[in-house]
């Protein structure tokens, strides 16, 4: 190591590498995107060290209008700078999401204008964060590393009901998708179920780093003994959207299971009104709806439950996905009740013990399996070891840094 006056010239020779990190959700927000990207950015910062700077461009917490938490607009932590774009208030409707992303898109371009970067990393579930990454990377003529958490074109093709709008929107989305994915240097697919869909994009190299288990769930798994009051509690926590299809399963299952089972639904989202309407239509009284809670409060809710619930709607697009929620629920020794199809169904069957598994929206199958189930608790230590978020993030950060 040079010493004295030569040290100044030595520092000039060191080239600091700059990474632009794009993610719509980041801590302290409550969402799968936030839980994935917050620890990954920290691991990237750690491995990059003093010769690497990371610019995170994200949003103020906005996942749920019913959950408010303060966060700094600009935050500097070591070699990482976090820029949070303030978004208009919304209720999670389609047009609300369009307006929110338009604001994020334009502000991100302003924040990054004139700055030098060596790599753009973009974590995207709705395609447009990936597209934002493409726009910036192409303008600056630098590599683009994408982390793809959903196949947005597939999802919109399934969810959108208006045929005229769909006929205009889907070709437009496919054009954006083609440009974005063909430009990318590398694409990480969060689910191996996406692999066949992406086989048409030949330019990038691929990895398959999944979601993982956060330490908060491993270290605070208290596992209290049931009080044996005769009523089983089934808890769902997360988004209440069209994608989860809770309005197609929980009211009907609650009616079929009867008073011996109590559902707790913790969360918010665009399809909550449909869930409420269906509960009222069926006159169901054994379902409790609660607002979103912090992760520490969620731990308490999980620990006081008997079953932990996961469900996706019966759309073809969802046969390729692997919901992040399974990594959260399987850390507890409680039985998991999962209504999923396709790749997620196979993944859970092969990796998660003590699970009540059924096809999406199949009320009769769920009710029958619940009634025939002999209650037990099972530790899933091998699953926890295999899918630790820390281990996955270390490998993924190394992969990202290899493109500098």
Where are these regions (language model features)?
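N-terminal subdomain of nucleotide-sugar transferases
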Residues: 7-81, 186, 251, 256-257
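Acidic anion/phosphate-binding donor-loop and adjacent secondary structure
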Residues: 69-70, 200, 212-231, 245
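Membrane-proximal helix-turn-helix segments that form the acceptor-binding/catalytic region
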Residues: 106-110, 128-131, 135-139, 152-153, ...
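Nucleotide-sugar-dependent
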Residues: 244, 294-301, 308-330, 337-349
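A charged, aromatic-enriched C-terminal amphipathic alpha-helix characteristic of glycosyltransferases
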Residues: 360-365, 371-404
């Amino acid at each position: 190591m040079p010493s004295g006056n030569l040290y100044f010239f030595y520092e000039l020779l060191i080239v600091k590498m700059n990474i632009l990190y794009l993610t719509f959700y980041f801590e302290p927000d409550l969402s799968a995107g936030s839980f994935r990207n917050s620890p990954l950015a920290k691991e990237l910062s750690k491995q990059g060290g003093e010769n690497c700077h990371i610019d995170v461009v994200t949003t103020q917490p906005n996942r749920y209008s019913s959950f408010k938490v303060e966060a700094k607009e600009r935050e500097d932590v070591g070699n990482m700078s976090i820029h949070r774009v303030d978004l208009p208030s919304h209720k999670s409707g389609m047009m609300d999401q369009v307006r929110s992303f338009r604001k994020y898109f334009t502000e991100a371009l302003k924040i990054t204008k004139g700055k030098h970067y060596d790599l753009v990393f973009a974590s995207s579930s709705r395609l447009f964060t990936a597209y934002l990454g493409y726009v910036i990377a192409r303008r600056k003529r630098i590599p683009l590393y994408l982390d793809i958490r959903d196949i947005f074109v597939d999802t919109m093709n399934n969810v959108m009901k208006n045929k005229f709008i769909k006929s205009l929107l889907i070709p437009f989305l496919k054009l954006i998708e083609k440009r974005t994915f063909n430009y990318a240097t590398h694409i990480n697919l969060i689910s191996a179920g996406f692999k066949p869909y992406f086989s048409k994009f030949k330019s990038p190299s691929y990895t398959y780093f999944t979601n993982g288990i956060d330490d908060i769930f491993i270290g605070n798994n208290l596992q209290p003994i049931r009080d044996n009051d005769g009523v089983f509690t089934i808890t769902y926590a997360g988004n209440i959207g069209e994608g989860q299809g809770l309005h197609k399963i929980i009211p009907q299952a609650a009616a079929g299971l009867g008073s011996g089972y109590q559902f707790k639904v913790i969360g918010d989202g665009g399809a909550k009104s449909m869930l409420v309407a269906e509960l009222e239509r069926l006159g169901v009284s054994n379902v409790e709806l609660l607002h979103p809670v912090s992760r520490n409060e969620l731990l308490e809710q999980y620990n006081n439950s008997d079953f932990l619930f996961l469900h996706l709607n019966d759309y073809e697009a969802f046969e390729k996905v692997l919901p992040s929620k399974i990594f959260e629920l399987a850390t507890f020794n409680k039985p998991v009740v999962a209504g999923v199809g396709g790749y997620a169904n196979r993944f859970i069957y092969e990796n998660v013990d003590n699970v009540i598994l059924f096809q999406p929206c199949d009320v009769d199958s769920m009710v029958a399996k619940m009634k025939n189930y002999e209650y037990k608790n099972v530790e899933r230590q091998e699953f926890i070891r295999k899918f630790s978020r820390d281990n996955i993030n270390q490998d993924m950060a190394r992969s990202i840094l290899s493109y500098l």
